[in-house]
């Protein structure tokens, strides 16, 4: 994960570092891994989220397509079958408390059996 982030432009390193810290604030037990040979993922009783840098933004994939988003952070992937996305562009503010709340919701559903089981 450190290597992935280190090779990004400075502004993307800052965003990834801040988001990474918030992910661990949501639950210190979250583990970091690389999936699909390049994608930083965070897991705890299942996939929680993943980061992916693009040319002009960072995608934060949240692995629960059925989760509520009371603060309106999710801005892509509403119709996706497995994840919804928060796209973060250079200069975008990161709403720390709202993001931590979303992450904690995914973790709670993972611990309860995962969104597929809960919605199935």
Set out the residue ranges of the language-model regions.
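Charge-dense, helix-prone N-terminal extensions
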Residues: 1-120
């Amino acid at each position: 994960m450190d290597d992935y982030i280190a090779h990004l432009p400075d502004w993307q390193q800052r965003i990834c570092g801040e988001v990474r810290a918030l992910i661990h604030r949501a639950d210190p037990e979250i583990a970091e891994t690389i999936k699909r040979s390049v994608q930083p993922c965070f897991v705890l009783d299942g996939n929680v989220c993943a980061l992916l840098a693009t040319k002009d933004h960072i995608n934060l994939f949240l692995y629960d397509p059925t989760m509520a988003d009371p603060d309106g952070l999710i801005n892509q992937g509403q119709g996706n079958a497995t994840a919804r996305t928060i796209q973060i562009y250079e200069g975008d503010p990161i709403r720390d408390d709202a993001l931590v709340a979303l992450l904690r919701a995914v973790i709670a559903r993972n611990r309860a059996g995962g969104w597929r089981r809960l919605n199935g």
